[in-house]
Amino acid sequence: MSAQDKLIKPSHLITMDDIIREGNPTLRAVAKEVSLPLCDEDILLGEKMMQFLKHSQNPVMAEKLGLRAGVGLAAPQIDVSKRIIAVLVPNLPDKEGNPPKEAYSWQEVLYNPKIVSHSVQDAALSDGEGCLSVDRVVEGYVVRHARVTVDYYDKEGQQHRIKLKGYNAIVVQHEIDHINGVLFYDRINAKNPFETKEELLILD
């Protein structure tokens, strides 16, 4: 039984046990494009990946299943070398602590996503980045594009082009890196992890 066959079984919930860690060669491979129209197995895998993200952000389910919270997951992280990513970016409560009207600012499974253009300006998260496949803390600014335009297919096989900036742009670049065999710490300056250039936008 392949990794994908196991993951898409109706009874299976993706947990941290399914997520491979740094050192596994799948994380350093360039993943293969999925065939269109999508097969049922690839659609199911995307749904399972999104289910994992929702569970990871739900305190009750996360504790029950022992999950680390995540806003994105790429198929190579569950040992499936395909160009499939899921993103689930929650909206935060307002300054008074009221819950947001919409739970998520972005919720999508992207098949064969590709960055087709990007800003000249770079950006990095002030707190750095983490990864479900990396169990250690790696400090430093992960330098990425401040704005990106991404082409992708949804589970219906419809093609989309989306322009992203800020945190959502960072998230999609992190996940697209995964399908290209790149890990976030590859983008940290090894000699000066917190190096700031004049044009670098630091996002809180």
Swiss-Prot record:
Spans through the membrane: none
Keyword Hydrolase belongs to the record: yes
UniProt cofactor(s): Fe(2+)
Binding site for Fe cation: 131, 174, 178
Major enzyme class: hydrolase
The family this protein is said to belong to: Belongs to the polypeptide deformylase family.
Cofactor descriptive note: Binds 1 Fe(2+) ion.
Gene giving rise to this polypeptide: def
Top-rank taxon: Bacteria
Pfam families hit by this protein: Pep_deformylase (PF01327)
Function statement: Removes the formyl group from the N-terminal Met of newly synthesized proteins. Requires at least a dipeptide for an efficient rate of reaction. N-terminal L-methionine is a prerequisite for activity but the enzyme has broad specificity at other positions.
Active-site residues (renumbered): 175
EC id: 3.5.1.88
Entry protein name: Peptide deformylase
GO biological process: co-translational protein modification; translation
UniProt cross-references to HAMAP family, sorted A to Z: Pep_deformylase
Entry keyword set: Hydrolase, Iron, Metal-binding, Protein biosynthesis
GO molecular function: metal ion binding; peptide deformylase activity
Record-annotated disulphide pairs: none
Catalytic activity: N-terminal N-formyl-L-methionyl-[peptide] + H2O = N-terminal L-methionyl-[peptide] + formate
